[in-house]
Amino acid sequence: MTIYHSVTELIGRTPLIQLHKLDTGPCSLFLKLENQNPGGSIKDRVALSMINEAERTGQLQPGGTIIEATAGNTGLGLALIAAQKGYSLILVVPDKMSREKIFHLRALGAQVVLTRSDVNKGHPAYYQDYAQRLADELPGAFYIDQFNNEANPLAHRTTTAPELYEQLDGRIDAIVVGVGSGGTLGGLQAWFAEHSPHTEFVLADPAGSVLADQVETGRYHDAGSWLVEGIGEDFIPPLAHIEGVNRAWRITDREAFTTARELLKTEGILAGSSSGTLLAAALKYCQAQTAPKRVVTFACDSGNKYLSKMFNDDWMRQQGLITRPQAGDLSDYIALRHDEGATVTAAPDDTLSTVLARMRLYDISQLPVLENGKVVGIIDEWDLLRHIGGDGDRFALPVTAAMTRQVEFLDKHAPESALHAIFDRGLVAVINDNDRF
């Protein structure tokens, strides 16, 4: 058994698995498990390559500070390696990234700066522009800039591509990739153009991104928005040689998330949202073929960073990505049903400190108060603030000291106007379904 001496030695040489329980048409579909890298994603390869090259060229000095703009996974790879090598790290991250990624980055010692995800390149709050400005202002800082760093595609040209070729004995008809920084596409294309020029490249692009437009028409318009993390752009990354892509598929958030969830259920592989996008496009490509082909795509990162989002049914419903059957009455308005175990509740004799802990744990702002299975009140953050004030001892008070009893009950068959009337009075409504809610 091999003994390793640094976590960085575990980067790369990831396993390849053939998928058997999804509809791949006449094709054989293989998934390279980049989620098995120590930082949990394909970006570990890129982070190691960029830091090694910066050290070699003298751009990064011992004890220096690295700055990067990242959707999360490059940051995790950089944080992992920076911690091993003794560098400080500042990461500028769009605010749509999952909490798990943010927690992981900070636990590795990175300083995380959140910025807006609703602005385009050129805006001062855009994450790449923000990172460049920080690097300019901080003496001795090195902006590693994965979007323009040739060591990014170099990682895939020297490791990912030859690994794939060896694992499949050189027989690869198509590779399905996504584009964030463009390094994976650019690096793989460069290597396969030399060693396997017949291999096709297929782009999996989130609906709303401009990259599929560029592939299909040679031009693009304003970007939309999407929830998938890590791939898709509102510009053409210079490292992504889009002209070498043979086909592109636009994948909606719903398709991406449901495909990733299906991958877990059928194949037992916990992968992230970008992996769902790639797999959905790969399945479309495979199903469109009339002759057998050997197709490869990637589990780009682990799904453990998305448990509070993509793998959370409540979050998926709130985003409109999964829906219940419509009943045609007020029960259609219920986001979380208590009879399905989906609500977090308090008891009248719980302490206010217990309520606050539950709000923080579940990231919610109010709780129904239940006694013998019946709602007797509601307690929210304002109730806590109003009753605690600056006196910490008051956290020991029971819920009944702070909750409001101004709750109105409606049968699910009541007219919508009755619900609107309750809201107009500033009250909380509980929808009853017989003896359930």
Give the residues covered by each predicted segment.
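Residues at the N-termini of beta-strands
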Residues: 174, 247, 366, 401, ...
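PLP-dependent amino-acid enzyme catalytic core
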Residues: 1-333
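Short hydrophobic beta-strand motif reused across regulatory alpha/beta modules
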Residues: 370, 376-384, 437
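Methionine-biased hydrophobic packing positions in alpha-helices, especially
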Residues: 50, 332-334, 339, 359, ...
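Bateman (tandem CBS) regulatory domains
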Residues: 244, 327-343, 350, 395-407
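The conserved cystathionine-beta-synthase
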Residues: 344-363, 370-371, 388, 408-427, ...
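A short, polar/charged loop-to-alpha-helix boundary motif
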Residues: 381-400
